[in-house]
Structure formats: structure tokens, C-alpha cells
Amino acid sequence: DVHSNDEIGYLAASLNYMANELNTLEEDQRKFVSNVSHDFRSPLTSIKGYVEAMLDGTIPVEMQDKYLNIILFETERLNKLTKSLLELNKFGSHGVMLDITSFDINHTIRMTVQTFEGTCMEKHISFNLILSGETLFVSADFSKIQQVLYNLIDNALKFSHANSAITIETTEKNEKVFVSVKDTGIGIPKDSIKKIWDRFYKTDLSRGKDKKGTGLGLSIVKEIIQAHGENINCISTEGVGTEFIFTLPLAKEQKEHA
């Protein structure tokens, strides 16, 4: 950087400003690529696992329809992620593009939970679903909320003990839907809770348990929820467990049927 009080100094300041703007743009692009890489890996791992299990006979022929439906669900996720990648140039320097529709959050939770069946069987972890009503429609970006659920459940599984349960609950209050993902795992140290939303951050407790993780999952979650104008909170006690609660707007048709 050049510093001076004359016109050359002013020109240098302008050039410095432009250089900083370019660096910001590059950082946003790097951030986007990091997000997409993280989100691609999850469904690909799921698809690979189920196909291998069908080929080696772990999944019997009579059960294959169920798992083929899960694979189809995951390929649809990949298709949506690919479209997001192709829309890279539409992203603002500080924004997430949202495609707002009405969809059933309860059904989305059930389908997302199914994709973790293999991991759950390995670790003997079960899901306890406490869903408000048979259907519960929200107004949000379907594929991005799917990413949020996937990342939160993946996180809960990673840090849960064997033979434990993860509770996912939906409740409706004041035209908002509250979604909670709660585990009874290792918990997060008090001094780390504020840092968990930072990119690439991992607590000392998680480093040994999450060798393959990028430290991006929760920062992606927060960015998506904030882009919707909603909130996400974390309640955690070390050695007891962690709960993530986020809000979404209730869909118009859900209000009319209330």
C-alpha cells in the first residue's frame, strides 16, 4: 500500500480500494465453492453406500425399492446443487439466492432422516420424531432448508454416542414454525458456542471425532437461515448434549387451514 497526501496518494488509495474489492469478490467465490463441495459430498457418500450395500447383498432384494427411493431423493438433491453451481454468477457479493415455495417441512424431515439410516444402524442411533400434525407447510427455499436439515442431523450423528437417540421436533407458534434438532452427545464447551458459526472452526472436542469434516456445515446453516430473515440458536451443555432450533415462516395455505 502507498500512503501520501498528494494526488498520487489519492490514486494509490483508489487502486488499493479496487484491489480490496477484487479480493472480496475472490473470497466470495472461494466461499461459494467451499459450500458447494461440502454439500456435494454428503449425498454422494449416501448414494455410494447404498449402491455398495445392494451390490454386496447387505440390502436384500425385497428391500431394494425403499433404498432406490432414497437414492432417487439424493440424486434430486445433487441436481439442485448442480443448478446452484451453474447460477454462481447470479450470487450477489453478500447474498444467497432463494427460490421461495410452500412445502411440507414434516415430510422433508422424514425423507432427510431416511438418508442417514446406514450411519444410524452402524452406531445404533435412533430418531425420535415429534412432528406437529401430519403435514406442516412452510414458506422457504426447499433445497436450501434440506441442506440445513442435512447438516444439522449430520452434525448430531457425528457427536452422538452409540445407543442414543436424536430428537427432531416441529412446533407452530405465532405464524412461525420452530424446528429443533437435539442430541445427547458430547456437547459444546461454553467458550466455543459463539465460534461454531465461523467457517472452518472446530472445537477441541470435535477434532478427534470429525477428521473428515470441513468445519463448514454450521456456517452454511446460519447463512441460509439468515438469508430467509429467520433465526437459529444453539443450546448446549458439555457432556449432556446439544440442541439447534431454527424458525421458518408458516406458509399461507397452512394459516388458512389453521
Where in the sequence are the language-model features?
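Conserved catalytic submotifs in the C-terminal HATPase_c
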Residues: 3, 99-104, 121, 126-136
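Short conserved segment of the HATPase_c
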Residues: 188-202
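Short alpha-helical segment of the dimerization/phosphotransfer core of two-component systems
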Residues: 73-78
